[in-house]
């Protein structure tokens, strides 16, 4: 089984100040802005060859989310064969947070925690879906 880091995700209260910070400090390039179904803004930035995801915090009136906190939210680990990777990790003793799901056709996700509580996202993203979203610049994929 082969794995690689796909992205790191950071939750922020003021997403635009974070975008500005990473652009000014690290010459980050915005590759995608989106607002998924729950209405929170998400911005993907490219820094060199790597991807950074900034996620806006929800409002205090929203229901509590067990994954909701400021700072590094999760590390996305890419799996070429999602089903095989999910089975492999379960066999190795991984405890998943909920069941795998597909938030958008072509994107498969599952969350688990490492022993100290950090959240890991197992992800398989159809490159064609992501490239199409990037080409549009603002997509709900």
PLM regions and their residue ranges:
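Vicinal oxygen chelate
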Residues: 12-16, 69-119
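Active-site beta-strand termini and strand-to-loop segments that position acidic
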Residues: 45-48, 112-115, 125
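Conserved catalytic-core motifs of GNAT/GCN5-like acyltransferases
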Residues: 9, 29-36, 101-103, 124-130
């Amino acid at each position: 089984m082969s794995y690689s880091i796909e992205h790191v995700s950071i939750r922020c209260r003021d997403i635009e100040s974070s975008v500005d910070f990473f652009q000014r400090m690290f010459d980050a390039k915005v590759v995608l802005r989106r607002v998924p179904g729950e209405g929170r803004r998400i911005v993907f930035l490219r820094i060199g060859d790597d991807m950074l995801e900034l996620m806006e915090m929800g409002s205090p009136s929203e229901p509590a989310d067990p994954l909701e906190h400021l700072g590094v939210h999760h590390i996305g680990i890419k799996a070429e064969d999602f089903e095989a990777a999910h089975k492999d990790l379960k066999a190795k003793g991984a405890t998943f947070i909920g069941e795998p799901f597909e938030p958008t056709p072509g994107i498969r996700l599952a969350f688990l925690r490492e022993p100290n509580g950090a959240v890991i996202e197992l992800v398989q993203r159809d490159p064609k879906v992501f490239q199409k979203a990037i080409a549009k610049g603002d997509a709900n994929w």
